[in-house]
Amino acid sequence: MSYTDLKQKIDTGEVVLLDGGIGTEILRHGYTWASHQLKNEPKLNLEIHKDYISAGAHVITTNTFQLSRRSFRNHFASDEHMALQGVANLTDRVGELVNDSVQLADNARKALGRDDVLI
């Protein structure tokens, strides 16, 4: 499906299914959503995306909640605090983490042969 197709579906009142809360699913699997699990558990993110696609989602979202320099600066008191928590230079890795998240969503589509699902 293209974005034009999506708009047409919405404009004509057709049902469009979006995925649910990725953070909620991460919690349901026994992990904390705050860590995103992009690096520690990429298969978890991949499987969540695949589950939503298999359930009929037309659109899946990326696991990028709070992935920004601002949110990291709000969460950590300083660069030293980040280093003490084992995430030194986290603010410099925002682009990498966002890219990883998008790639996992795309990998889920490809694994299921569902390039028609939008991200």
Where do the PLM segments sit?
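Domain-level signal for soluble alpha/beta catalytic cores
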Residues: 1-119
